[in-house]
Amino acid sequence: MTKDLLALLKERGLFVQANFEKELKQLLNQGSFAFYVGFDPTAPSLHIGNYVLLHVAQIFQAMGHIPHVLLGSGTALIGDPTGRMELRQMMSRETIAENTRNIKKQIRRFLGSNVVFCQNETWLKKLNYIEVIRELGPCFSVNKMLATDAFSARWERGLTLMELNYMVLQAYDFYYLNQKYGVQLQIGGSDQWANILAGADLIRRKTQKQVYGMTTNLLVKANGEKMGKSASGALWLDPQKTSPYDFYQYWINLDDASLQKVFLMLTKLDTKAIETLCNLKGAAIKEAKAKLAFELTDAIHGTKAALVAQAKSARIFAFQPDTETKTVRAGTRLVDVIVDLGLVVSRSEARRVIQQGGLTINQEKVTDVEMVLQASSQPLVIGKGKKRFVTVQVIANTK
């Protein structure tokens, strides 16, 4: 017997909560229906945290349901206050339009052609402010809005009318999509629960229809820290912003405690295979991390890129010494590092080796004698010639 969709999502750690869960389960078993996920184009690329929603959309799509992707070209002009302690910087319409085009291309890679794209600027810009106050205003309780996490955390620091209206506009998005496309379910991250419920409640008040909202877990490590952040920034899905190799290496260096969670949430491996991999002990756990790195790089960048990243990682770290990785502060000059680590005896020799092409970092030749090392989540293998290698971890300078 095929496992029902909500049970599958729960098993994979992707389900947090839903309103009217019993009724939603019945609806999912009745046949194809329309659902939506939304992304505000506040950056030129989606990141790994956004991929959780895309992966859930893929699961729904594989079971015959129709994904609608809302690109928040209108709401991005305001900015979602959720999880923020300060007012977002205003973005230009030109930047938002460019980001929207880029993100739409990215999403097509994951959802293919059987997806409906919508941009909320097309209907939000037509709203008349007086009509909004008259028609939508009575449907929202300011007391309830201020009690939500998104707003309560900002109350003492100051909350603008612009930000307060974000929830109203997102709720209206759900209402509009329900009226035009028959969308019956909104899926979002767990931090969007209040906004999702506001949309479902607006539809109930305006149409007397029951619609559904569901939230997924956010991608966080076992210690609660948000995953996908590194010393060099977010883990982007755009290969120009985060290379497939750097993406691969991020998962190679994932902490052991978070391994099973990521396998379940973001890969399609069956649970028994995941359990076997995550039960590996000691040095063998590296096999599980290599499997995770390959599976995710394959899913995001394709098999060819995953194979290239895998091969590059194997080449680089085949030279990695067995000795402990050395720690270096960001901002340290490379010539000083290789002297301190004993690869050369003096700074003049260090410069000469670099100028002659005899020094590599991760098998890439170094030519800049003035190079300064930057903080990185990935270790660096520094090599002199073909036989001498040391591994360093560059950490942020907190002084």
Curated annotation (Swiss-Prot):
L-tyrosine binds at residues 36, 166, 170. CDD domains: S4 (cd00165), TyrRS_core (cd00805). One of its GO terms (biological process) is tyrosyl-tRNA aminoacylation. Gene3D superfamilies: HUPs, RNA-binding S4 domain, Tyrosyl-Transfer RNA Synthetase. The keyword DNA damage does not apply. A motif ('KMSKS' region) lies at residues 226-230. Its main location: cytoplasm. Residues 332-395 form the S4 RNA-binding domain. It catalyses: tRNA(Tyr) + L-tyrosine + ATP = L-tyrosyl-tRNA(Tyr) + AMP + diphosphate + H(+). Its EC number is 6.1.1.1. Keywords: Aminoacyl-tRNA synthetase, ATP-binding, Cytoplasm, Ligase, Nucleotide-binding, Protein biosynthesis, RNA-binding. A motif ('HIGH' region) lies at residues 41-50. ATP binds at residue 229. Belongs to the class-I aminoacyl-tRNA synthetase family. TyrS type 1 subfamily. Homodimer. Catalyzes the attachment of tyrosine to tRNA(Tyr) in a two-step reaction: tyrosine is first activated by ATP to form Tyr-AMP and then transferred to the acceptor end of tRNA(Tyr). This is Tyrosine--tRNA ligase.
